[in-house]
Amino acid sequence: MFISFEGIDASGKSTVMDLFAKYLKIKFPEKEIVTTFEPGGKNLKEALQIREFLLSKNNQISPYVEMLLFATARRIHLERLIWPALKAGKIVLCDRYIDSSIAYQGFGNGLDIDLVTSLNSLISENTFPDLTIFLDIKISKAFERMGIFRDHNRDRLENRGVEFYEKVINGYEFLAKKNKNFFKIDGNGTYDEVLDLIIDFFEKYYASWPK
């Protein structure tokens, strides 16, 4: 089982994903739960070096180069972590995946959507999540969280304006309409409230999942 979590920066997806992993460990005690993230991946030196480069405020790169770097890190992530884990029958939860590239590089940065989609289909060999959970949060709330928790330490990708994030959200809305396995969850509540919404949805969704 492969589940990705999506949302704009400071949407709470990282925290909620970790909480959801604890729920899955109880629901599926016989399964190993693997949590990971993009860009980068847990303990993947090369992919994490790309992540550090992408997030650094000191690096000024074009949207096209950004797209290629994300794709490169994703391929490493797949080869070294995601594919082996799925092959071993583990449940993989990933904080960001291909949909982030479409929403951020495609809609946010204005690159051709078909180009971004085709590139990521190629490098992933059409490996897509069984389920994608998109935490839909107001931009004002996300910016409030960024200010409270990160102050002046925002990275290059977080340090963008409202107009950019509006485009990104439009991208996620596009994906929600296009992909039958892409589901929107209200992310404006507390972490526990959002987790309850996800668990309630997952229980119903998994009950109808082909076994």
UniProtKB/Swiss-Prot annotation:
<keyword id="KW-0545">Nucleotide biosynthesis</keyword>
<dbReference type="GO" id="GO:0006235">
    <property type="term" value="P:dTTP biosynthetic process"/>
</dbReference>
<protein>
    <recommendedName>
        <fullName>Thymidylate kinase</fullName>
        <ecNumber>2.7.4.9</ecNumber>
    </recommendedName>
</protein>
<keyword id="KW-0418">Kinase</keyword>
<dbReference type="GO" id="GO:0004798">
    <property type="term" value="F:dTMP kinase activity"/>
</dbReference>
<dbReference type="InterPro" id="IPR027417">
    <property type="entry name" value="P-loop_NTPase"/>
</dbReference>
<dbReference type="InterPro" id="IPR039430">
    <property type="entry name" value="Thymidylate_kin-like_dom"/>
</dbReference>
<keyword id="KW-0067">ATP-binding</keyword>
<dbReference type="InterPro" id="IPR018095">
    <property type="entry name" value="Thymidylate_kin_CS"/>
</dbReference>
<keyword id="KW-0808">Transferase</keyword>
<comment type="function">
    <text>Phosphorylation of dTMP to form dTDP in both de novo and salvage pathways of dTTP synthesis.</text>
</comment>
<dbReference type="GO" id="GO:0005829">
    <property type="term" value="C:cytosol"/>
</dbReference>
<dbReference type="Pfam" id="PF02223">
    <property type="entry name" value="Thymidylate_kin"/>
</dbReference>
<feature type="binding site">
    <location>
        <begin position="7"/>
        <end position="14"/>
    </location>
    <ligand>
        <name>ATP</name>
    </ligand>
</feature>
<dbReference type="GO" id="GO:0006233">
    <property type="term" value="P:dTDP biosynthetic process"/>
</dbReference>
<comment type="similarity">
    <text>Belongs to the thymidylate kinase family.</text>
</comment>
<keyword id="KW-0547">Nucleotide-binding</keyword>
<dbReference type="InterPro" id="IPR018094">
    <property type="entry name" value="Thymidylate_kinase"/>
</dbReference>
<dbReference type="GO" id="GO:0005524">
    <property type="term" value="F:ATP binding"/>
</dbReference>
<dbReference type="GO" id="GO:0006227">
    <property type="term" value="P:dUDP biosynthetic process"/>
</dbReference>
